[in-house]
Amino acid sequence: MASTYSFDIVSDFDRQELVNAVDQVIRDLKSRYDLKDTQTTVELGEEKITIGTDSEFTLESVHNILREKAAKRNLSQKIFDFGKVESASGNRVRQEITLKKGISQDIAKQISKLIRDEFKKVQASIQGDAVRVSAKAKDDLQTVIQRLKQEDYPVALQFTNYR
């Protein structure tokens, strides 16, 4: 039996689910009557999604479709960082949506401080873009998970590597 138990707190998303969601958005754009003739483009890059369209109204419709398709695929809305809308050639608008991955040092420090302040029997250590939480009892770790789910961080948190 292990003397200590641990898990990792990470901020990540399933890339294949995102690819599927973007493919569904593109399919929707081709079939929806109000968006069919807008010549809207949605491109998925390594770390961003680029949307080009006729107007800001159409852009907002694409946002709604993207959020809906992502939610159906169990992707958090917090992975999307919507950039500012730019003017493109020919009365078109373009927007880049950065995909957030990993926990920043500031957020990792906030999580670590919350765990240290509220749970005396639990240790938290920052490891790159993840936080490792360890304790002698599994129940303590489950309590930490429940407490962190109540907090609202600007990134989506997943709990992995539960040992």
From Swiss-Prot:
GO terms for cellular component: cytosol. InterPro entries: DUF520 (IPR007551), UPF0234-like_C (IPR035571), UPF0234_N (IPR035570), YajQ-like_sf (IPR036183). Keywords: Nucleotide-binding. GO terms for molecular function: nucleotide binding. Nucleotide-binding protein. Belongs to the YajQ family. This is Nucleotide-binding protein Ava_2001. It comes from Trichormus variabilis (strain ATCC 29413 / PCC 7937) (Anabaena variabilis).
